Amino acid sequence: MSLNKVILIGRLGRDPEVRYMPNGEAVCNFSVATSETWNDRNGQRVERTEWHNITMYRKLAEIAGQYLKKGGLVYLEGRIQSRKYQGKDGIERTAYDIVANEMKMLGGRNENSGGAPYEEGYGQSQEAYQRPAQQSRQPASDAPSHPQEAPAAPRRQPVPAAAPVEDIDDDIPF
């Protein structure tokens, strides 16, 4: 038995870029920063930031492209996937990407482009979009290929206001 699951909460380092593959499916790419802080042996505060390349597909990609913005806080679930490429120096390298299949926008209006503080989850919808497309394959024709229309995204549910948390470091590395 094996498991490949990644859960991240971080801030977008750039606005998402959405492209469309020849078959009409959307692909979205962006980066997310996660940080951890600790005190070293001398009592000095140390921070390390990791950057993660995120890829999303289909309807989730379109939603991310529409609603996520640089600096916004986001919760992501997915899997890690490696890919090999050749660097400018000719050496083969390996990159690791997170293929996200669930997303929740965290924070309020200023964090992303939503209204009051909302939490939006689209993970289950993503799986629903994969299945019908696989079942309804049609022979190729001269007409352009379009993804199957999917049900509307879940309604926004207000998140109750949380009590302020002490000692939060709001330094964003971008």
UniProtKB/Swiss-Prot annotation:
Motif (Important for interaction with partner proteins): 169-174
Molecular-function GO terms, alphabetical: enzyme activator activity; single-stranded DNA binding
Pfam families on file: SSB
SUPFAM superfamilies the record matches: Nucleic acid-binding proteins
One of the GO BP terms on file: DNA replication
Biased composition (Polar residues): 123-139
Organism: Neisseria meningitidis serogroup B (strain ATCC BAA-335 / MC58)
Keyword DNA-binding attributed: yes
Name this protein carries in UniProt: Single-stranded DNA-binding protein
